[in-house]
Amino acid sequence: MKRITYLLLLCAVGLMAQEARSQNPAPVTFTAAQDHQNMMDQLGIKALRPGPSGDANASNHANYDEALANPFPTLPDVLTLKNGKKVTTPAMWWNQRRPEIVEDMDREVYGRVPKNTPTVTWTVKLSDKEFVNRTPVIAKQLIGHVDNSSCPQIDVNIEMTLVLPLNAKGPVPVLMMFGFGRLPSPSQPTPAELAKINDALKALLLNSDPSLKEIFEQHPAYQPFAPATGTGGFAGFGPPTPPREATPDIPGVPGVNNDLPSTEQLLADGWGYATINPSSIQADNGAGLTKGIIGLVNKGQPRKPDDWGSLRAWAWGAARALDYLEANEPTVDAKHVGIEGVSRYGKAALVTLAYEPKFAMALVGSSGEGGAKLNRRNFGEAVESLTGTGEYHWMAGNFLKYGASDATFGSKNPGDLPVDSHELIAMCAPKLTFISYGLPAKGDANWLDQQGSYMATIAAGPVFKLLGLKDLGVSNDYKTEKMPPVNTPMLDGQLAWRQHDQGHQDQANMKWFLKWADANIGHKTSTSSTGTRP
């Protein structure tokens, strides 16, 4: 009887899944160009202006002349309501002005997160005790399965790697980083364990192919799995690489990278870190918009003009990962979790801090257009760079309107945007916000518009001050303030800026971020940065 009941239950589950599939039309399969055209058709756009070229010899090369960089010099006032009334109290900011900005950002720039986003169930794939440099850690690989019962044809499994110091005396702050994570230094078999593995493997091979006996007798010292340095040896077996030290600073010689990897700096300071794979949340291309979390919620159908783009989707996924840390990891100080990213992931980090309330801080690296750079600036990367087929998927469909040269509504340009990036930075207040850039000569290209990002940071300052915090400590006149010299730390407030002397990375600013964040959250290193390998 129990067996019959079990079989009936299995049949019922199968029928329910089949019914869910039959109720949904098949997911649409578009190329990026087809999806882009679909959105143009929805918006009534007939033609878009091409984005500027990074090739200095091209006819439409990007502008790098500061005299031509500000065709729309006046930004929307971050502390003026749409009715013209000045915002003078924190209550007016929270209850009136910020909601206005959020609505415009949602509708026109980054898109709306649906109200019916599904739940995420996390599973620990493996947990491993490892060493990172001299710090003993516990490293975990996790999968967050997104409930796809509404559209079983689409699977979304969020990938996260979590690394925490093993000997912490209490909960530690964590920096979550957008990127492709892996276990830092997987533990290896001891010599005795390796010998046992080799004996078993040889026996298995001989049983499968007795002719191998002659080969093994000719090479008696051969071992299929041999200890090796780093990740050498057959199939990567071998001890981890030995501890590394940062090279000493060289006084008077700028541009020399003396920094350990960011992950090692974090652990040495008593932090943990997590890496979250953005592509496991939402593909980084337009062809993927009917898949991933955006496609799942839309049941495989194309976006509407105010639907979310990949930047909001990545931010949503990061927030679900923070939900897991808060609920399941007592050694994580969930009130002091930050978000980090560089380049497109720098954009995502800024969007995450602005929208997701549980994140306490961000290190926003070289984020450019769609991130900290002012949209109204004509310098390097432009709005039109993000309205073409290559990068439009980051944004709401409505963002395409601001690159339109011919449409049923006429044409629009960046000056028509109701909001700009200084307001995105202001949305982060009162949380700790560190804007980071590098040196164009070292690879952090002028294309990113460091000056335009500095202007946006300056223009966001009044909101931090209204909320009783400190900004960069200079005037809020974004039209006249110029960037300070390279390597000048502007870290006295909760809004921070530093341009380092390296390339397209934020590793060179990590020690500055940690010093600044530690001071603001009252963190003291709680782990030993030295350790002995077993």
Predicted regions and their residues:
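N-terminal pre-domain segments of enzymes
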Residues: 19-113, 231-241, 516, 525-534
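Mobile cap/lid helix-loop segments that gate and shape the active-site cleft of serine hydrolases
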Residues: 252, 293, 304, 320, ...
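Conserved strand-to-loop "acid loop" that flanks and positions the catalytic carboxylate
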Residues: 429-449, 500-502
